[in-house]
A protein has these predicted regions:
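Generic structural signal for secondary-structure transition and capping sites
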Residues: 23, 35-39, 90
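Enriched for short, Lys/Arg-rich terminal
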Residues: 12-17, 24, 56, 61-98
Length: 98
């Protein structure tokens, strides 16, 4: 089963502001969500975590030590919707994650 990756306007703007190398790294990591968007502890498949933010279930993906993507998974539509991508420090400040 393959999921479509959809980026919000904010996520697209963040990507557009990155240098070419950083944008490539972020895109490569987001593409991995096409096959497996859910966290799989111990699998070595990236730093993903299920979160509850403002009563909504969403997921977090650390990309390197620089960026964090927040996304929701819609199984019935086979979609991963990337809600936001932010600098990792901003993610920690805003959401209080370690």
């Amino acid at each position: 089963m393959s999921f479509d990756i959809l980026l919000s306007q904010n996520a697209r703007e963040y990507l557009g502001a990155l240098d070419e190398k950083s944008a490539r790294i972020v895109k490569d990591n987001l593409r991995k969500l096409e096959e497996e968007p859910y966290p799989r502890p111990g699998s070595g498949s990236g730093d993903r975590e299920k979160l509850h933010v403002d009563g909504e279930e969403m997921y977090r993906l650390h990309i390197g030590r620089t960026h964090t993507a927040f996304y929701v998974v819609l199984d019935e539509d086979q979609q991963v919707r990337v809600v936001e991508i932010v600098d990792i420090d901003e993610a920690h400040k805003r959401y209080g994650f370690d």
